[in-house]
A protein has these predicted regions:
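Short acidic/His/Gly/Ser-rich catalytic and metal-binding motifs that mark active-site loops
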Residues: 84-91, 174-175, 242-246
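Acidic-and-aromatic substrate-binding clefts and catalytic sites of carbohydrate-active enzymes
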Residues: 23-31, 50-64, 140-144, 173-183, ...
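A structural signal for the main folded, soluble domain(s) of proteins
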Residues: 3, 17-49, 147-165, 186-187, ...
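A cross-domain feature marking catalytic cores of carbohydrate-active enzymes
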Residues: 19-21, 51-55, 75-82, 134-138, ...
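Active-site acidic/histidine proton-transfer and metal-coordination neighborhood
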Residues: 91-195, 298-307
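N-terminal pre-domain/capping segments
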Residues: 1-95, 100-112, 203
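Acidic (Asp/Glu)-rich catalytic clusters
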Residues: 6-11, 34-45, 58-84, 115-127, ...
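Histidine-acidic metal/acid-base catalytic patches
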Residues: 2-7, 111, 115-123, 149-150, ...
């Protein structure tokens, strides 16, 4: 396959926007969310929305179906909000848990997510979601053997629905500084995904949180390209100082440094990460925070600027 024309080829890769950090606060009646989804659809290059799953999707399935149908057919569900909530309450909860009950709870949780996808598709009358991002919880005690078992056990649940199984790498146990997630290392996740249908997604900010080294996302992407396991490349920032969104080194989806000076996410680093993927990614996208009172126009401008830096590779 010829991958020399990277910008042209990258346009054929589904582009996903994690819009949930940008949703307006106090959004009575969800009118702000509806306007954001419509505006993202009107951009013409957003193929899917990354939707968070906590104990449910963040809006009723019929409402979401109305916003997404006819606009986005490459949506991704991320299990990270619910996984973090459950793992915070139960230290053995997770798909990579060495505790049988904790792993069983995580399998049941994941299947409840898949049932929500079924309801969303039923309401829409079409397939909107193509991939689901899973995570190697629990904190501090995850094992690749348990994670492999879970991914294997879920394979039929995913295949029967035509859904791609994605492992989204987060900061690993043994990283630099106080950890945010302390899940499995990338090498352990690669081992866990072997002989399964799972691919692995790199989130720029989450890889940087692990090492406090802005070259880590690029090296993580290269490693996954070499092993044939690269799923997605998601661009999302991180940084060493407290911001309007969160504390230092939080998983706060910081925007580009030109919009948030403490963010380590620069156009050059984005371009280097995209070059490392070399067109091997099965999807790509971005997830950034914007100020709570940002206008819709400003949100679209910030999102468009990140995409511009991705295409600049």
């Amino acid at each position: 396959e010829n991958r020399t024309d990277t910008p042209a080829q990258s346009r054929t890769v589904p582009f996903v926007v994690g819009a949930y950090p940008m949703l307006p606060p106090d959004d009575e009646g969800r009118s702000g969310a509806a306007a954001l989804y419509a505006a993202l659809g009107d951009l013409g290059w957003v193929d899917g929305i990354e939707l968070p799953f906590r104990e449910a999707l963040d809006a009723p399935e019929p409402w979401l179906a109305e916003q997404l149908a006819g606009r986005f057919d490459q949506c991704v569900i991320t299990a990270i909000p619910g996984t973090m909530g459950r793992a915070g309450a139960d230290p053995v909860f997770g798909l990579a848990s060495p505790d049988d009950d904790g792993r069983a709870q995580a399998l049941a949780y994941t299947r409840s997510l898949l049932e929500a996808v079924d309801r969303l598709h039923e309401a829409a009358g079409e397939q909107l979601v193509t991939r689901v991002e899973l995570h190697s919880a629990p904190h501090h005690q995850a094992t690749p053997e348990a994670f492999h078992a879970s991914l294997s056990e879920l394979s039929e649940d995913f295949a029967s629905r035509g859904l791609g199984m994605i492992v989204e790498h987060c900061d690993a146990e043994g990283g630099v500084g106080p950890s945010e997630k302390a899940f499995l290392t990338l090498a352990q996740e690669i081992a866990a995904c072997r002989d399964t249908a799972a691919l692995i997604t790199v989130n720029w900010g989450r890889s940087v949180i692990e090492t406090h080294d802005p070259s880590t996302p690029e090296s993580h992407v290269r490693e996954l390209v070499e092993t044939g396991l690269l799923g997605g490349v998601m661009i999302s920032g991180a940084g060493p100082e407290e911001t309007q969104w969160a504390w230092a080194w939080a998983d706060a989806h910081l925007p580009l440094a030109e919009h948030e000076p403490t963010s380590w996410l620069t156009p050059e680093r984005v371009a280097a990460t995209m070059r490392a993927a070399d067109g091997a990614q099965v999807y790509e996208g971005l997830k950034i925070n914007t100020p709570a009172r940002a206008s819709l126009e400003d949100k679209l401008a910030w999102v468009s600027r990140v995409r511009e830096t991705m295409l600049g590779a």
